């Protein structure tokens, strides 16, 4: 069984200063190049699920090979090295010619590059993608990729486990029900919100053992040259960022200076009476 994880890293926007948000609101561009990169939360869950599936497969004498790929720039090499230490036998980087933040909005471009990359590989049984990224937040890439490849797509997946015979037991959340089914490849699984799926940290021994594993680099121009005309981002349209602003987290508050508990309770009661 061959599993491919398509993951994405994002800038840690919690570290962005208020002044940078204000300046970006007017220009439509926020410089995040100096911010630390972190794993997109949905992709992190997908990567951890792959690790768990591989472990369960090994204990059941089932062959399972995991590959990780990302569409980004050289900043993500440390993440791919981490994947290698965690047992991913393939660690591939699709390097963008222009990795500006606005390009994160081009879902067609990302899906097209992943499509061309997958067509150059030995066939995968399952492709795992996160629900959406924390920067573009469009949620289009997994659906576009499944459509381009012509394979089944299951959204809002909350659990997977090996079911034998190269298949997976997949749990997915629907509007009014939780569905559990045995899925055969090729299929694309969109990983949703799952609790307690932080990606594990490799040990020093694991890092030392994976030092010799090379990261395979694919250039955008190389993959874009094999785009079918109907998948060419230049002909499918793009999204242009026109404005960006932070969500205000401030709340109005009043301070009552009362040291006696009963008096403080009375003040609060009088205050809340006007809302009842």
Sequence positions of predicted segments:
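Short, glycine-rich nucleotide/cofactor-binding loops
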Residues: 30-46
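Conserved acidic residues
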Residues: 89, 125-126, 186
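Short Gly/Thr/Asp-enriched flexible loops that form oxyanion-binding sites at enzyme active sites
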Residues: 136-149, 153
